[in-house]
């Protein structure tokens, strides 16, 4: 699910689809989901790389850096990877934009989570809090900038970063801020939902459910079953 299911969920939001209705009924038997999966499959079959059904973050990053991927929708944190001239052959040719929409009022923007968590059962709570405070501090950001460059500082830790003249020179800085400010996890889809989350439903059961559903979608992309069959199994 974390490889292909995350993207398709973001896309589905812009098509008006949702994982569950307000009564927690699965919604894969809807026209919105059929439109989402068919659009993605048709687009990738026509213009995507061979074996796209099994590609994830690392495969897509590698292709983009080699100039073999013309459009990649993923996390804003990946922007520094594709603009680093030491790793990317297209570093000086990359542009950035908000993810597209279908005219229904919601973009297919990527949003996983900006969060650092501490396990409830930890014996090192104070140390964990101290680490998080340091890892999100201005001192840490300046340390990264000094050693790795401003393009590589954590983009989601501090609002004040976007007021820094040096960071404002980074080509994707403003687009990253726009993306963060446009995120709305409580209203990620066209229709109301009982869950919070843009690319997932924030419930304990979701990872297992989403893995099963994503495997059915991947089988459809690979031609092992039809889109209709995949959606029927997801609905079940």
Predicted regions: what they are:
Residues 64, 227-236:
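Short, well-structured alpha-helical segments that form the helix of a local strand-helix-strand
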Residues 66-75:
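Alpha-to-beta junction loops
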Residues 51-66:
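Short helix-initiation/N-cap motifs at beta->coil->alpha
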Residues 208-223:
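Solvent-exposed, amphipathic alpha-helical segments
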Residues 1-26, 32-33, 69:
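Extracytoplasmic/periplasmic solute-binding protein
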Residues 17-26, 45-47, 65, 111-116, ...:
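Flexible glycine/proline-enriched surface loops and loop-helix/loop-strand junctions
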Residues 77-91, 102-212:
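C-terminal lobe and pocket-closing loops
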Residues 23-54, 95, 99:
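Glycine-centered hinge/linker elements that transmit conformational signals in sensory
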């Amino acid at each position: 699910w974390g490889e292909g299911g995350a993207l398709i969920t973001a896309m589905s939001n812009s098509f008006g689809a949702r994982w569950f209705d307000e009564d927690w009924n699965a919604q894969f038997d809807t026209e919105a989901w059929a439109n989402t999966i068919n659009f993605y499959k048709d687009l990738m079959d026509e213009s995507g790389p061979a074996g796209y059904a099994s590609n994830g973050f690392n495969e897509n990053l590698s292709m983009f850096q080699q100039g073999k991927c013309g459009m990649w929708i993923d996390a804003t944190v990946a922007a520094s990877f594709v603009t680093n001239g030491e790793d990317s052959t297209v570093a000086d040719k990359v542009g950035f934009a908000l993810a597209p929409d279908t005219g229904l009022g919601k973009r297919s923007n990527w949003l996983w989570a900006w969060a650092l968590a501490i396990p409830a059962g930890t014996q090192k709570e104070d140390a964990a809090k101290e680490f998080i405070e340091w890892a999100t501090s201005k001192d840490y950001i300046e340390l990264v900038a000094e050693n790795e460059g401003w393009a590589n500082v954590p983009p989601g830790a501090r609002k004040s970063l976007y007021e820094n003249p040096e960071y404002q020179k980074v080509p994707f800085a403003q687009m990253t801020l726009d993306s963060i400010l446009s995120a709305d996890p409580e209203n990620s889809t066209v229709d109301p939902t009982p869950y919070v989350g843009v690319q997932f439903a924030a419930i304990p059961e979701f990872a297992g459910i989403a893995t099963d559903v994503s495997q059915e979608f991947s089988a459809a992309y690979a031609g092992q079953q039809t889109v209709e069959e995949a959606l029927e199994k997801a609905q079940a």
